[in-house]
């Protein structure tokens, strides 16, 4: 650990500043960690303070930063500062209170908190989201465009409502339809500005692989009237959600099923010792016997070790007790099975998709492998319903397109061409990644993992087992409010209705 007082003075001064802000705003701090003591021999930890701030608000009061509509005005809320350029906290609290009033009344529709990069960076980032342009007026001094302005806010205001604002503001420009950033005679195409911003670290953290392609995928849709009908009706079906070490989507999955009207049984697979494992197998077997559906949730079971995703998941369900219980649910009780993300990986490894039964994998078996970019991806993808074979999609139509979150490191669907063609012919290709025109594509902006034939989800031969990468369970009324498009595939409602 270094004894250099200058190195220690930097985080110390930052902590004093953070403490002053806490006192000024009347806010508490929760915990802290000293990592500078990690400096050892040739390992050097630079003097750094990292702060995370969390607030609570009503869902309907949340706004997002991207520009919404051409013609809307841009205003600059400047906080009051003292002779040392520090916030006058009482005045700032009053300004922020009025700012919240303007949000609640619907006058302010987007906003961005300024930082060390100033107005130009803030307006640019606001423009990138919806590819709306922005014109900044000359009343903004060019020296202020890139000057730090901590605490200030740039807000987008509904056209015609600027004069009704409760906040004290300076009007600085407007939103334009043309995707251009303009200041006086200077005009920069939005695409060029975004490339300059995101391209800085492209060589270090690539956003596209060398194999990225704009190649289109042959369109093959499957419509059938021969959809499996349940012969074991029940008023309120039960779903069993097994939880393994590393699973992290069980709460979202349970909430989605409960909202759809199902009973939920959740059990954790304990593996501290042999007795725990035997007990967990018995509990899982009993839960499957009580359920009409089983859902394998997303996450990183066993940390995706050893050497691959969902191996722990699949190994557990190859236990004879669990194997027989699952096949009894499917074969004798007309049950359903669903796997999302890590759960899809488990279904693939078990053979439940595409075979519809637990079997050993062979050289012709499809698999889900590392994303083409070689790392984890997390974004919203557009997926299209390619087949109506599955009861899980009874409430949607072939060719419907949805905006679905994806988050995985191994989601690239790979199989031999003859296997894929057979899946299409049987209607087992359930969903595909598509571009803005609704066409399946190999472009990584839309097919983020590089799946063959843009395949996002497949089913068993009769459609009762569905595996997909996209997290349909994460949909909620106020989740992703700035993401456009249909988000609810009604998978969970369809699963429940299948038994009624």
Predicted regions and their residues:
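N-terminal beta1-alpha1 cap of cysteine-dependent amidohydrolase-like domains
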Residues: 184-340, 344-355, 369-377, 442, ...
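Short hydrophobic/aromatic beta-strand micro-patches
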Residues: 154-158
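Solvent-exposed alpha-helices and their adjacent loops that cap or buttress functional pockets
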Residues: 22-23, 41-45, 66-69, 101-104, ...
